[in-house]
Every structure is written in structure tokens, then in C-alpha cells.
């Protein structure tokens, strides 16, 4: 499959993804207080000792390093969506993504650029339809594995 490139990663990009996705624990003001009050232990004290959301690892370097990450990093579900983006670009409007399974292997911190490559590993027919299995992986600019996956797509027969 043609290579797809994502990045370089930025904190703005991480926040934009959270805005579109909805952010699992991101709340403000009264809603944040209600959430932390309802779910004890969810609010992790920030530098002002105010309970704040755990998703700060995606935009706050100091907090990210406290949990063992190299710095602020991307969202795992976004990486999974990149893998489906990669294959759906290739199969086009007439193809259908049947399944996609991914395994996340490392953080993508701010500054990383990700290169997604894929290979057709199987072709088969079922009930008169044509299918392909694609194995793909994403690596950063240093060649470190970020995520890998296997997808199956139904393609129109010629």
C-alpha cells in the first residue's frame, strides 16, 4: 500500500483530536467538580494541588514524564484510526473495511513523525466476493514501532 505520513506530532494536534473525539475525562468548572466528586480517585492533583483529569498526559509534559512517558503524547485511539484511514484510502469508495485489529507498542510524543506502511498478506474469495488481508505498521522517524495491525477488506471483483 502507499505510505501514509502523520505528523509531526504537536500538542495542538493532541487537543484537536480530544475535541473531536469528546475526551473521556475532560470537563470544565462545575462539570469537572461533579465528575471528580462522583468518581473518587479520578482527579489527580495538578501543580496547584487541584484535582484535574488524567488526560493531562497528552498536553502536559511534566505530568506525562511522571507516569513514565517521554513527554506529552498522542491518543491511542487516534493511532488506531490512522490504521483504518490508511487502508480505506487504498480500498477507495467501492471497498469495504470488514475488520481492523491493532496493537499499540509505544507513545508518539510531541515532535514525532509517523510513517504507516502496509502489505497485502492474503487474497481470498468468500461467497463470491473478493477479500484482501493487509498487515500494516507505523514507525516513527527513528524506525521505532508505534502500532501494528491486520485488516481485512472486501473489494469489488473486476
Enumerate the predicted regions with their spans.
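Conserved short hydrophobic patches within well-ordered secondary structure
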Residues: 87-88, 109-111
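HotDog/MaoC-like acyl-thioester-processing domains
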Residues: 1-19, 110-158
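Short, conserved secondary-structure segments in the cores of folded domains
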Residues: 69, 103-106, 110
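Phosphate-handling active-site elements
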Residues: 91-97, 125-126
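Short alpha-helix capping/helix-loop boundary micro-motifs
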Residues: 1, 99-105
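Hot-dog-fold acyl-thioester-processing enzymes
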Residues: 2-94, 158
Amino acid at each position: 500500500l502507499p505510505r501514509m505520513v502523520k505528523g509531526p506530532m504537536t500538542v495542538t494536534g493532541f487537543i484537536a483530536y480530544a475535541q473531536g473525539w469528546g475526551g473521556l475525562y475532560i470537563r470544565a468548572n462545575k462539570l469537572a467538580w461533579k465528575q471528580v466528586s462522583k468518581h473518587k480517585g479520578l482527579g489527580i492533583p495538578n501543580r496547584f494541588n487541584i484535582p484535574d483529569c488524567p488526560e493531562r498526559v497528552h498536553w502536559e509534559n511534566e505530568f506525562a514524564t511522571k507516569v513514565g512517558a517521554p513527554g506529552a503524547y498522542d491518543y491511542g485511539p487516534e493511532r488506531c484510526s490512522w490504521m483504518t484511514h490508511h487502508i480505506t484510502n487504498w480500498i477507495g469508495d467501492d471497498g469495504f473495511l470488514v475488520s481492523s485489529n491493532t496493537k499499540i507498542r509505544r507513545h508518539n510524543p510531541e515532535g514525532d513523525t509517523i510513517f504507516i506502511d502496509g502489505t497485502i498478506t492474503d487474497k481470498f474469495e468468500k461467497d463470491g466476493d473478493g477479500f484482501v488481508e493487509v498487515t500494516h505498521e507505523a514507525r516513527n522517524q527513528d524506525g521505532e514501532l508505534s502500532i501494528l495491525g491486520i485488516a481485512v477488506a472486501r473489494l469489488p471483483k473486476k
